[in-house]
């Protein structure tokens, strides 16, 4: 398959999911309402009154779960919309079809991460403007954002491929493995909070002096290799075991 066809498949999956989920009016409204509520909380209870700006970073713990669900939705949609027969019989290899969905899900994930951290940064700057730079240590804030972003990007391919595999297994002869995959999803999604607990356990000043240990950097390539193996498993199931 040439590059132009792959771009078409990628663009199709990306735009379809964008219209079905990201561009819905209720998503925009909920996002605006949430930001306004958090801004109000920072204004009333911010910093010395108990609600430190750095606590907002813990909202990122939901992102690994959302990452999995993005890729799960991209593939499971073919069954829900009744288009699995059309999609799977397209004159392209199963690996190309799954790779296009993986890339579309990855782009959606990057979009979510950008919106999330952009929104949190606006809230942090607002809190600093209200309470002063001495009360809101922005250096620690940006350090925490960078650490969390590295962990999220490091584990994202693993969660994305696990989402595709789970969707494929759900409608295959291996459906009995579905509960096990959902357990793996729960454990993998909790990795960020587990790592944050380790990093902050001996940091009384929170994220200000936290740093990623070497073993996390070393684990990221291994996670990406494992993601490649999981994607290969999903391709095999879609090619030989899927029911439609």
PLM regions and their residue ranges:
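Central hydrophobic cores of alpha-helical transmembrane segments
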Residues: 174-187
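Perimembrane helix-loop junctions in membrane proteins
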Residues: 77, 81, 124, 128-132, ...
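Transmembrane helix boundary and interhelical loop/hinge segments in multi-pass membrane proteins
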Residues: 51-54, 70-88
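Hydrophobic alpha-helical transmembrane segments
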Residues: 1-61, 65-66, 73, 146-150, 168, 176-179, 217-221, ...
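Active-site alpha-helix of zinc metalloproteases
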Residues: 8, 96, 100
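Short helix-to-coil transition segments within interhelical loops
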Residues: 88-94
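Secretory targeting signals
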Residues: 37-67, 99-176
């Amino acid at each position: 398959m040439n590059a132009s066809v792959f771009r078409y498949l990628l663009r199709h999956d990306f735009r379809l999911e964008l219209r079905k989920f990201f561009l819905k009016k209720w998503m925009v409204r909920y996002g605006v309402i949430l930001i306004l509520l958090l801004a109000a909380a920072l204004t009333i209870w911010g910093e010395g009154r108990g609600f430190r700006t750095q606590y907002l970073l813990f909202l990122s713990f939901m992102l690994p779960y959302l990452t999995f669900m993005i890729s799960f939705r991209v593939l499971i949609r073919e069954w829900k919309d009744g288009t699995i027969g059309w999609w799977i019989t397209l004159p392209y290899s199963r690996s190309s079809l799954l790779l296009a969905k993986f890339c579309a899900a990855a782009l959606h994930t990057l979009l979510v991460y950008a919106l999330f951290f952009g929104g949190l940064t606006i809230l942090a700057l607002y809190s600093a403007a209200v309470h002063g730079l001495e009360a809101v240590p922005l250096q620690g804030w940006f350090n925490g954002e960078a650490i969390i972003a590295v962990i999220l990007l490091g584990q994202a391919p693993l969660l994305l491929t696990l989402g595709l595999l789970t969707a494929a297994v759900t409608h295959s002869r291996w459906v009995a493995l579905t509960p096990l995959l959902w357990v793996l999803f729960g454990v993998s999604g909790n990795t960020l909070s587990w790592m944050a607990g380790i990093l902050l356990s001996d940091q009384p000043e929170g994220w200000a002096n936290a740093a990623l240990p070497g073993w996390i950097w070393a684990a990221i390539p291994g996670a990406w290799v494992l993601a490649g193996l999981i994607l290969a498993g999903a391709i095999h199931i879609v090619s030989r075991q899927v029911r439609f």
